[in-house]
């Protein structure tokens, strides 16, 4: 259950970030088109890299929680 609550928190964090970021206007392009093609600025690229890193951390933490139980 701790992994599930962490995922809910992660989704809320992403929604908050997307609403605060200028990327929210082009978020549909960002998900459909390859991220490297839609990197028009430094902020968008950093946000994408941060998102992927956070996603990786969530996967690793969930795997660790599953193994520890």
From Swiss-Prot:
Keywords carried by this UniProt record: Antimicrobial, Disulfide bond, Fungicide, Plant defense, Secreted, Signal
Disulfide cross-links: 45-57
Signal sequence range: 1-19
Organism domain of life: Eukaryota
Localization (cell): Secreted
Gene Ontology annotations of biological process type: defense response to fungus; killing of cells of another organism
GO CC annotation terms, alphabetical: extracellular region
Record family assignment: Belongs to the DEFL family.
Protein name: Putative defensin-like protein 312
């Amino acid at each position: 259950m701790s992994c599930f609550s962490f995922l809910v928190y992660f989704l809320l964090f992403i929604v908050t970030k997307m609403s605060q970021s200028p990327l929210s206007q082009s978020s549909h392009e960002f998900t459909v088109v390859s991220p490297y093609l839609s990197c028009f600025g430094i902020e968008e690229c950093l946000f994408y890299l941060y998102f992927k890193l956070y996603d990786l951390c969530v996967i690793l933490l969930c795997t660790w929680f599953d193994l520890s139980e």
